[in-house]
């Protein structure tokens, strides 16, 4: 039996490298590679995109769109890690835990869009609540994200790992202060929101690992923290990669690096003693469940390996 052929278009980048590392030791897949000197050669890329059973696009948005146009073989499937297609109607959103039907949608899809890292945490917290009517779609939501510097873009990665100059090197910074972060559209669509949330991303001096938090005033919702927690527990029951902590087991400190190197996602509900407030929190590796780990999970679904 022929092994499925996998091509990582953009394997030299952070996400591409990590996906390749996760797949390199597998005997059930054949990895196709492009000559490094031709990695921006459209003809060379097209040859591999059309030879592969699944190509994983680890590219900026415009290059990802180009890869789609280059893939003319109807039997070749695409898994896009960029933001280009996450809310496109022809693409299936690659968060298998979104619903009971989502894994099968991914299995059957020709085009799958891998979620963003911040949005993975936010959607994981919000979707079960909006879907059950506990959080109105037009509720004013505030989301805070705290990531290692790999979540802040190429300039920050280069500053920390290659010694290039950057004014925020080594510091804790808030960015995306226009409040129009690129993960907002998918967070709204798949988080079940009709009103734009206020989302503030932040990065620190560690390499990877993140937390995403959503503070809520419960009196405005008319629900308890226990009800929110029960909804999350019900939604993610039996999931391999998502764990909802019991209220009594919540850690006093959330270290964003705890899940580094894994495809795991942990969810927490922190109730205030007065019963009037709660903090929803998600913890994940921004390069794991937020990128390469999720890509491998989606790839396995697309190939019928899980």
From Swiss-Prot:
Pathway assigned in UniProt = Amino-acid biosynthesis; L-arginine biosynthesis; N(2)-acetyl-L-ornithine from L-glutamate: step 3/4
Alphabetical list of PROSITE patterns matching this protein: ARGC
Q: What class of enzyme is it?
A: oxidoreductase
GO CC, sorted alphabetically, is: cytoplasm
Where is the protein situated, by its record's location annotation?
Answer: Cytoplasm
Q: Source species, please? A: Deinococcus radiodurans (strain ATCC 13939 / DSM 20539 / JCM 16871 / CCUG 27074 / LMG 4051 / NBRC 15346 / NCIMB 9279 / VKM B-1422 / R1)
Q: Identify this protein by name.
A: N-acetyl-gamma-glutamyl-phosphate reductase
Q: What is its EC number?
A: 1.2.1.38
Q: Could you tell me which InterPro entries the record lists for this protein?
A: AGPR_AS, AGPR_type-2, NAD(P)-bd_dom_sf, NAGSA_dehydrogenase, Semialdehyde_DH_NAD-bd
User: Which keywords describe this protein according to UniProt?
Assistant: Amino-acid biosynthesis, Arginine biosynthesis, Cytoplasm, NADP, Oxidoreductase
User: Function, please?
Assistant: Catalyzes the NADPH-dependent reduction of N-acetyl-5-glutamyl phosphate to yield N-acetyl-L-glutamate 5-semialdehyde.
The terms under GO molecular function for this entry are:
N-acetyl-gamma-glutamyl-phosphate reductase activity; NAD binding
Entries under PANTHER family matching the protein: N-ACETYL-GAMMA-GLUTAMYL-PHOSPHATE REDUCTASE, CHLOROPLASTIC-RELATED (PTHR32338:SF10), N-ACETYL-GAMMA-GLUTAMYL-PHOSPHATE REDUCTASE, CHLOROPLASTIC-RELATED-RELATED (PTHR32338)
Write out the catalysed reaction: N-acetyl-L-glutamate 5-semialdehyde + phosphate + NADP(+) = N-acetyl-L-glutamyl 5-phosphate + NADPH + H(+)
Say which family it is in: Belongs to the NAGSA dehydrogenase family. Type 2 subfamily.
Name the catalytic site residues: 117
Q: Which GO terms describe its biological process?
A: L-arginine biosynthetic process
């Amino acid at each position: 039996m022929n092994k499925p052929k996998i091509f990582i278009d953009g394997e030299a980048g952070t996400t591409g490298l990590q996906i390749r590392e996760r797949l390199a030791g597998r005997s059930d897949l054949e990895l196709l590679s492009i000559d490094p000197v031709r990695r921006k050669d459209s003809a060379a890329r097209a040859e591999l995109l059309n030879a592969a059973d699944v190509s994983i696009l680890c590219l900026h948005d415009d290059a990802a769109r180009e890869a789609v146009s280059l893939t003319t073989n109807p039997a070749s499937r695409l898994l896009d890690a960029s933001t280009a297609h996450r809310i496109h109607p022809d693409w299936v959103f690659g968060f298998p835990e979104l619903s009971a039907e989502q894994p099968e949608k991914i299995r059957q899809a020709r085009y799958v869009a891998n979620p963003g890292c911040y949005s993975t945490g936010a959607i994981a917290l919000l979707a079960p609540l909006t879907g059950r009517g506990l959080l109105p779609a037009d509720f004013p939501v505030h989301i805070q994200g705290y990531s290692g510097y790999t979540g802040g873009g190429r300039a920050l990665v280069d500053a920390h790992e290659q010694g290039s100059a950057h004014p925020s090197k080594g510091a804790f910074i808030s960015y995306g202060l226009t409040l129009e972060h690129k993960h907002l559209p998918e967070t709204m669509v798949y988080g079940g929101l009709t009103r734009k949330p206020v989302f503030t991303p932040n990065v620190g001096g560690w390499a990877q690992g993140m937390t995403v938090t959503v503070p809520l005033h419960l009196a405005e919702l008319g629900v308890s923290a226990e009800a929110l927690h029960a909804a999350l527990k019900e939604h993610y029951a039996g999931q391999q990669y998502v764990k909802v902590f019991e209220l009594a087991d919540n850690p006093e400190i959330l270290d964003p690096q705890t899940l580094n190197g894994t495809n795991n996602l942990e969810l927490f509900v922190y109730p205030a003693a007065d019963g009037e407030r709660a903090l929803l929190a998600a913890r994940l590796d921004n390069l794991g469940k937020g990128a390469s780990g999720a890509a491998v999970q989606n790839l396995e679904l697309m190939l019928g390996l899980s």
